[in-house]
A protein has these predicted regions:
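Interhelical loop and helix-boundary elements at the membrane-water interface
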Residues: 12, 16, 21-66, 94-110, ...
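Nucleotide and nucleotide-moiety/phosphate-recognizing core
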Residues: 5, 9, 54-100, 119-122, ...
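Alpha-helical transmembrane segments and their immediate juxtamembrane flanks
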Residues: 162-190
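Topogenic membrane-insertion module of multi-pass membrane proteins
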Residues: 1-6, 19-22
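Interfacial segments of multi-pass membrane proteins
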Residues: 48-51, 74-78, 89, 93, ...
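Loop-to-transmembrane alpha-helix initiation sites
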Residues: 125, 141-149, 160-172
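Alpha-helical transmembrane segments
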Residues: 5-16, 171
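Membrane-interface helix-boundary signature
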Residues: 52-55, 79-83, 141, 162-168
Length: 223
């Protein structure tokens, strides 16, 4: 792969990764600037907290899709190495998007899943499933993201991925952990916010402080 090909694939991946779906969709449908609420990131998890599950689902699919599109272009152009180069560009674009003035984007989790879907499909599916299971079990999106990203490199290796693909996913895992450093600090202090899962048939959200206080003050009736 020539230097020119590397540069072109990296730029193409970056432009695709820069599409800030979380910002655009939440702005269009809710009027909110997702960068001004919650974690201030444009990723799907922050969208879920402040725009609902349907919006989360759409943003997650689009963020996965842009990672897959970048990797697919790289794969078609220069094989697995090209997929890695374009995929890396997509991650950088999601983190510091061109269309938001190179300012803060997302934490690259969904886009990493999208790239992995092309270079290691089975590993990508397992990563996504693991993310969901950890989220349901702990209700911490940060714990789910860190756990799933750490599992990805060995999964890629287990499913027969090449060393460039393993190295790419290892680098992505390190980047994801670094982007969650504030979350890690809050977890260590016990101040990280749990995620309220409001889905049909799944009511694992914690009671509000007022409801909890009311429950604790409730006494049995006098007979």
């Amino acid at each position: 792969m020539s230097l020119l090909t590397i540069v072109l694939l990296g730029v193409a991946g970056y432009v695709l990764g820069s599409l800030p779906w979380g910002y655009w969709l939440s702005r269009f449908f809710t009027g909110k600037d997702i960068r001004e609420v919650g974690s201030r990131g444009t990723g799907a998890a922050n969208v879920w907290r402040h725009a609902g599950f349907k919006m989360f689902f759409a943003v997650a699919l689009l963020d996965i899709g842009k990672g897959s599109a970048a990797a697919a272009i790289g794969l078609a152009t220069a094989g697995p190495s090209g997929a890695v180069v374009a995929g890396a560009g997509a991650l950088v674009g999601h983190w510091r998007p061109l269309f938001l003035g190179f300012k803060r984007g997302g934490k690259i989790v969904a886009t990493t899943v999208g790239v992995a879907l092309v270079i290691a499909p089975l590993a990508s599916v397992v990563m996504a499933a693991l993310w969901w299971m950890v989220l349901v079990a702990t209700r911490y999106t940060s714990v789910a993201s860190i756990t799933a990203s750490l599992a990805l490199p060995p999964l890629v290796l287990m499913f027969g991925g090449s060393w460039p693909e393993v190295a790419f996913t290892a680098g992505a895992a390190i980047a994801i952990i670094a982007l969650h450093r504030a979350n890690i600090e809050r977890l260590m202090r016990g101040t990280e916010n749990r995620f309220a899962l409001r889905l049909p048939g799944l009511h694992r959200h914690a009671p509000t402080p007022i409801a909890a206080a009311a429950a604790s003050d409730r006494t049995p009736p006098v007979r």
